[in-house]
């Protein structure tokens, strides 16, 4: 978590983690997670495509809305595979200060 005041993404990630054991009948997040990682990944992909469409169309408000949906579904997909937002942040920290070209080359 980043600092004493968690960001909106951290609060959302914490809520998603808390919903992992919730009743799928009362929680949309629990319902998604109960369907398994593959379904969570599918939903993330659908939302990402919707965000892409709005980016191409140029509708700022709709893009913001779809981006929020995409981030939510990314966090759900990560939670389905027991990957935390902190895990992703650690990877970003590891990459910081390296050029994208250099970083991509190091993965080959």
From Swiss-Prot:
Key words, A-Z: Amino-acid biosynthesis, ATP-binding, Cytoplasm, Histidine biosynthesis, Hydrolase, Nucleotide-binding
GO terms classed as biological process: L-histidine biosynthetic process
Pathway the protein contributes to: Amino-acid biosynthesis; L-histidine biosynthesis; L-histidine from 5-phospho-alpha-D-ribose 1-diphosphate: step 2/9
Location in the cell: Cytoplasm
Biased amino acid composition, Basic and acidic residues: 91-108
Reactions listed under catalytic activity: 1-(5-phospho-beta-D-ribosyl)-ATP + H2O = 1-(5-phospho-beta-D-ribosyl)-5'-AMP + diphosphate + H(+)
HAMAP family found in the cross-reference section: HisE
PANTHER family: HISTIDINE BIOSYNTHESIS BIFUNCTIONAL PROTEIN (PTHR42945), HISTIDINE BIOSYNTHESIS BIFUNCTIONAL PROTEIN HISIE (PTHR42945:SF9)
Protein name: Phosphoribosyl-ATP pyrophosphatase
Species annotation: Paracoccus denitrificans (strain Pd 1222)
């Amino acid at each position: 978590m980043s600092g004493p005041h968690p960001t909106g993404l951290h609060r959302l990630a914490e809520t998603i983690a808390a919903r992992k054991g919730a009743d799928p009948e009362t929680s949309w997040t629990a319902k998604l997670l109960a369907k398994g990682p593959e379904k969570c990944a599918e939903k993330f992909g659908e939302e990402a495509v919707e965000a892409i469409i709005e980016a191409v169309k140029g509708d700022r408000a709709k893009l913001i809305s779809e981006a929020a949906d995409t981030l939510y579904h990314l966090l759900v997909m990560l939670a389905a595979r027991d990957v935390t937002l902190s895990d992703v942040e650690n990877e970003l920290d590891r990459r910081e200060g390296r050029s994208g070209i250099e970083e991509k080359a190091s993965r080959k």
